[in-house]
């Protein structure tokens, strides 16, 4: 059966972004350090339309996280743009340019309705104003039997974790302290249904994969 998979980079003190996030600084102060391990990987650069890159112990982790995904769910904060209702005078299309790295349907959970946004490379953003269960139902239909990825940010990840809807979770732990920002596990509580199944130590990061028991 197709799975719901979640992967995110996190600091040692549990944050997935730094403090003082803004449109100008979407990762917050120091937040770029969460992803330094990834951005030079060949397996990260390829779906972004970039050539070259490194191959190391993180390569297989990244390739595995991208393989078999048929649809992605994210929150409004990850998609970005100014908060509140969408501004037709400033038609925000995400952080990723004309050809985003997803190359499949993406469902953005938001309080504000907006028509679907089709971009190059097979990525279409659909804006879901219903609950997370409806967003997942739409993503499953679009994925056509493949897995669904929950991309973040922290608040949407928390919602799916608290609802017990995540089958696999990959935490890429970066050796930095942010001191504030979005805490991944704020209000989530224990997750007894998930067990550690793999640990990979790589340059600048340690990857922990958890899977549903049974």
Where are these regions (language model features)?
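Enzymes that bind and transform nitrogen-containing heteroaromatic metabolites
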Residues: 1-214
């Amino acid at each position: 059966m197709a799975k719901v998979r979640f992967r995110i980079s996190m600091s040692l003190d549990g944050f997935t972004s730094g403090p003082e996030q803004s449109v100008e600084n979407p990762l917050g102060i120091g937040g770029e350090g969460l992803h330094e391990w990834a951005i030079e990987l060949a397996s990260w650069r390829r779906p972004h339309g970039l050539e070259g890159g490194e191959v190391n112990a993180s390569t297989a982790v990244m390739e595995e996280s991208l393989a078999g995904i048929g649809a992605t769910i994210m929150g409004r904060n990850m998609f970005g743009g100014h908060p509140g209702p969408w501004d037709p005078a400033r038609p925000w299309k995400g952080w990723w340019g004309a050809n985003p790295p997803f190359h499949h349907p993406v469902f953005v959970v938001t309080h504000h309705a907006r028509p679907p946004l089709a971009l190059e490379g097979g990525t279409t953003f659909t804006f879901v104003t219903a609950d997370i269960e409806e967003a997942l139902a739409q993503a499953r239909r679009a994925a056509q039997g493949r897995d669904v990825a929950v991309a973040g940010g922290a608040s949407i990840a928390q919602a799916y974790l608290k609802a017990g809807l995540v089958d696999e979770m990959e935490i890429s732990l970066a050796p930095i302290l942010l001191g504030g920002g979005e805490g991944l596990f704020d209000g989530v509580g224990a997750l007894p249904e998930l067990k550690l199944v793999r640990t990979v130590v790589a340059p600048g990061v340690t990857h922990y994969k958890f899977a549903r028991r049974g």
